[in-house]
């Protein structure tokens, strides 16, 4: 099973690495992901505006979609925000779920890593979503960090450079 997953990850990485950057309406992507989730009954909102950005579209979609899926899986709701700056675009996926302890936040980016407790096996998944999300953010020249949400929960912060 692990060898099959490794082969799948290698294939996906090769496909995304060869993808050519293009000008993308990131705001439309975020709004579309929110609308799709809302159509399935999810409590998700989007706020903020941004100008288009040169990115690999599949990589960005994979990154943001994995983060939104995690927020909805573990918290049952999410807020996605866009913050546009001259030098970078910041995308936040904010939830008020159980959160992740500060000392475990980097570990969740390791393949197949699963937390004990509320963010765990009951929710499904195999522990690859955060790995894929960070790898995609880094391929886009950006970074993905996890922070505590004020009042409780988790905020995933994607910072993408404007080139």
Locate predicted features:
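Short beta-strand/loop element within the Bergerat-fold HATPase_c
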Residues: 77-87
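Conserved polar catalytic motif of the HATPase_c/GHKL fold
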Residues: 65-66, 70
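Short alpha-helical Gxxx[C/S/T] motif in the catalytic ATP-binding
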Residues: 124, 129, 133
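Acidic ATP/Mg2+-coordinating residue in the GHKL
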Residues: 95
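Conserved DHp (HisKA) dimerization/phosphotransfer helix of two-component histidine kinases, i.e.
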Residues: 1-40
């Amino acid at each position: 099973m692990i060898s099959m997953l490794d082969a799948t990850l290698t294939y996906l990485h090769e496909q995304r690495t060869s993808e050519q950057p293009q000008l993308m309406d990131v705001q439309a992507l975020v709004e579309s992901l929110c609308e799709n989730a809302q159509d399935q009954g999810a409590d998700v909102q989007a706020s903020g505006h941004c100008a288009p950005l040169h990115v690999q579209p599949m990589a960005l979609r994979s990154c943001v979609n994995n983060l939104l899926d995690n927020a909805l899986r573990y918290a049952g709701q999410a807020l996605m925000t866009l913050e546009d700056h001259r030098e970078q675009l910041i995308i936040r996926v904010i939830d008020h779920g159980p959160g992740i302890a500060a000392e475990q936040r980097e570990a969740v980016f390791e393949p197949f890593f699963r937390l004990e407790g509320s963010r765990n096996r009951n929710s499904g998944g195999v522990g690859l979503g955060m790995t894929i999300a960070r790898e995609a953010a880094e391929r886009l020249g950006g970074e993905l960090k996890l922070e505590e949400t004020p009042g409780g929960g988790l905020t995933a912060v994607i910072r993408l450079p404007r080139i």
